[in-house]
Every structure is written in C-alpha cells, then in structure tokens.
Design a protein with these regions (language model features):
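Glycine-rich beta-alpha junction loops
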Residues: 39-40, 152, 232-234, 283, ...
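Short hydrophobic alpha-helical runs that function as membrane-insertion/retention elements
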Residues: 225-229, 283-285, 349-350
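Surface-exposed amphipathic alpha-helical tracts and adjacent flexible/coil segments at the periphery
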Residues: 268, 279, 289-296
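Nucleotide/pyrophosphate-binding catalytic subdomain
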Residues: 1-268, 273, 432-433, 452, ...
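A conserved regulatory-domain signal marking ACT and ACT-like small-molecule sensing domains
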Residues: 292-458
Length: 458
C-alpha cells in the first residue's frame, strides 16, 4: 500500500481534482490510501465563519455559509455532469454536511460564544466536504473507492485545536479500518487534519496537519511510500520569494527535511517526518501539475551524500538574553531557566550559552511577558525584537572542513547576534536583523550554491 496526500491547491477546482483523480488512477496497482486537505482557501473560509458566529454577526455567517455551499455544489455539478445519479447523490451529501454545519454556527451565533470544541468541529468541515466530493468523482471515473471517516481512526489527545496523536490507538485502528474499507475496492479516501479523542469528541491536528495525518497513516499501515502532492516540483534549496536561482533537490535525508521544515521551509509540515522515520518509509514531494516530474525523495540518511542542501530562515523571531553571575559554578541554573519556558509553554529554537549568559530565540508570535517576569526574579533579562534566524542545513555540514568559513565569509558586513550548531551536525544557525534577512539569504545562497569556488576571505 501507499499513501497519497493531496494538498488544498492540488484539489482546488475542477482541473485540479480531475488531475488528482487521474494521478490516483495510475497507481491502483499500489493500493493507494488517499488523504486530502480541504479545497484551497476553504479552511480560511471556515475560520471566518467561526469568527463571525462568535461575534454574533448572523448576516455575515449566512453569506459565508452560502459561499461555502455554493462552491462545493457547483464543483460537484461540474465534475459529475456526465453522471447524473452520482451527481444527485453527491449534492445531497454536500447539502447534508452544510446543513449540519449551518445548524451549529447559527447556535454559536445566537449565544455569541465559540468554544474550542465547536471551533474544531467547524473548521474540520473542509476536509469532510473535499473528501466526499473527490470520492464521488473517483467512483464516477471507474475507480471503486470507499470513504473512511478519519475521526474513527485518528485518535488524539483531548486538545480540540491541537490534538496530539495517540500513536498506540492509531496503530491499532488504522490498519483495521483501511482493510475493511478496501474490501472489493480499488482505493480508499480519508481526511487529513481531523481526528477525535478517545471519547469520540472531534479534534484537529492544527494548521498544516494533513501532511502529519498522511505520515501517521503511512506508519500505521507500513506503507511502501508516502506521496505528498503539492503545487511545486519538490523541495528547493531556498525560498524562491527571497532567492531567484534556487535549485530543486532530488533527494534529502529525513534529518535534513525535518530541519528544513522546522526552520521555515513551507513544503512540509514540521511534524510530518517523524512517523515516517520510525518505519523508514520514504516520502516523495511531488507536483500535481507536473505528475511526471521527479520531485524530491526524502530517504534515510545513509542514502544521502554529505553537504549543504538548503538555506532556510524564520523571519520573525526575538532573542531573549538572560544574564546572571549566579550561573557560574551553580548546578541547576539552566534547569530552572528552561522549566520557566516549559511551564509557560514558550517554545525555544536556538540556544547559546556562556559562563554567565544564556541566549535563546523564540517565535515573535509567542507571548513571553510572564516568562520574562519570572526570569527577571533571579537574572537580568534583555529582549531583542525584530530579528530573523537563518539556518544552513545539510548532512554532516558541521563536520565538513571550512564549513563555518564558507557560511560566514559572505556576511562580513552583517551583524550576527548568536550562532548555534545543531548536535545532529545537520544545521548551522545564526541570528540577524530582520531588515537584513533578504540580503543575507540571497548572498549566502549565492556563495554556497551558485559560486562555491569564489569565496571571499575573512
């Protein structure tokens, strides 16, 4: 079996869904388990519906619900124009889903109160609708397909909007559900992003969670491979919005891909890699508009050559500097510092320490006031805003001769605030002023990828 995940842009409209179904049809001999996101922009629309309902804006709620319903009904009518009976059934099912959703959002609108539980139910409807539509289309094209409700097998914690997968339950349920659904079928289809807790309450995995769903399902069924279908030809050496001459990477390691995702690459959800690594399942990032393209293969490390693969970045970060003479020759100081970050649920990226100073980076979107207040009780704390983080990523780059020189030689005119080398030898990261980010990434990529033989001297 294989897992084929199609993102929102790969199922956005008539043409995209037609292509996706054609692609699935070419892999029936591999027994595909198809995982789909909501149609492009539909999750955003559902967030708007939930926000409008929470504010009691009934007129906006009705307008947005009409937009949601019309988009899917019109799409069904277009895709199934040659199959009137299936079209009628599909329209009926789409209307049932929309009617149930409308009932909930009107209730929310009436009380002007939106719980996390109800928000999770609302925003998950995009995947329920898209998977329903595509299932009907696949059957209309002669691909016998069963629809699986992900909520019956993707079990998570009871955190409604950021459910943590319960791998034990997922490993127990997914193979059974998939095997049952595959009886007499050519393919099965299910939803990314959504699940439920052990009590049956609906949850979601958080934004971008469809990739994660696909990887978890792949792990559970011991998939031969996991295909992530997007609208790009694979993983690039840098963000093309910052760098003109980026290169597509034919293959990278699990570790490199995980670092790229964590440090800002947009192709994969950061958590996607972990379940696949556990079973050594290769992941292929492919382009649904160019299905014959090679894409990028993400493989186990021993199949990948040493060297630089990517220049990645996080645009909006802040640096928290913690200074205290009590650090010197004092056991437990670091533990105390990081317990405060943990207790306040503030995630730390880079860490740099000296005898009396700790510097860490955190995403600018995180609330840190309470953390800073608690740290200030026993240390001096300085926060630097408007910073960006740049990471050079590649297998064993920390061990390569001259790699630090190659990384920092182009940056002599730039202020570098802290440097961190990953313990896995896969990344070298540093912090710069946000206003200098674009030029730093451009220069670094130029010297590492385009003209590596022409490096300036220190």
């Amino acid at each position: 079996m294989i897992v084929m995940k199609f993102g929102g842009t790969s199922v956005a409209n008539f043409e995209a869904i037609t292509r996706a179904v054609f692609i699935v049809g070419g892999r029936l001999d591999q027994k595909p388990v198809v995982v789909v996101s909501a149609l492009s922009k539909v999750t955003d629309l559902l967030y708007r519906i939930s926000d409008a309902a929470a504010c009691g804006n009934s007129e906006e709620v009705e307008d947005l619900m009409t937009e949601l319903r019309s988009r899917h009904v019109n799409l069904v009518s277009e895709l199934l124009a040659q199959s009137p009976m299936l079209k009628d059934d599909a329209v009926r099912r789409v209307n049932e889903i929309c009617d149930k959703l409308a009932e909930l959002v009107r209730a929310v609108c009436a009380v002007r109160e939106l719980s996390d539980r109800n928000k999770a139910i609302i925003i998950s409807n995009g995947e329920l609708l898209s998977s329903t539509v595509i299932c009907f289309v696949m059957n209309a094209k002669g691909i016998r397909t069963n629809w699986i409700d992900a909520r019956e097998m993707m079990i998570t914690s009871n955190s409604y909007l950021k459910g943590e997968p319960d791998e034990k339950e997922i490993l127990a349920r997914v193979p059974v559900k998939v095997a049952e659904a595959y009886e007499g079928m050519d393919a099965v289809i299910t939803q990314g992003f959504i699940g439920s807790d052990i009590a049956g309450e609906q949850t979601v995995l958080g934004r971008g969670g469809s990739d994660y769903s696909a990887s978890l399902i792949g792990m559970a069924i011991d998939a031969e491979k996991i295909e992530i279908w997007t609208d790009v030809d694979g993983v690039r050496s840098a963000d093309p919005r910052k760098v003109e001459n980026t290169k597509y990477l034919e293959k990278i390691s699990f570790e490199e891909a995980a670092e790229m995702a964590h440090f800002g690459a947009k192709v994969l959800h950061p958590l996607t890699i972990e379940p696949a690594v556990k079973k050594n399942i290769p992941i292929y990032v492919l382009n649904s508009t160019n299905p014959s393209g090679k894409g990028t293969a993400i493989l186990r490390s021993e199949l990948i050559e040493d060297g630089v693969k990517s220049v990645s970045f996080k645009e909006n970060i802040r640096v928290i500097n913690i200074f205290s003479m009590k650090m010197i020759n004092t056991s437990g100081f670091l533990r105390r510092v990081f317990e405060i970050f943990s207790d306040n649920k503030v995630s730390v990226d880079l860490i740099s320490t000296s005898e009396a100073n700790i510097s860490v980076t955190v995403d600018s979107s995180q609330k840190i006031d309470k953390t800073v207040q608690e740290l200030s009780e026993f240390a001096e704390v300085f926060v630097d805003d408007d910073k960006s983080q740049v990471s050079v990523i590649g297998k064993n780059i920390v061990k390569l001769n001259g790699m630090l020189k190659r990384t920092f030689a182009p940056l002599k005119k730039c202020n570098v605030y802290m440097i961190s080398q990953g313990a896995s030898f896969v990344n070298i990261s540093f912090v710069v002023d946000r206003e200098e980010l674009a030029e730093v990434v451009k220069e670094l990529h130029y010297h590492l990828f385009e003209q590596p033989e022409e490096l300036p001297e220190f």
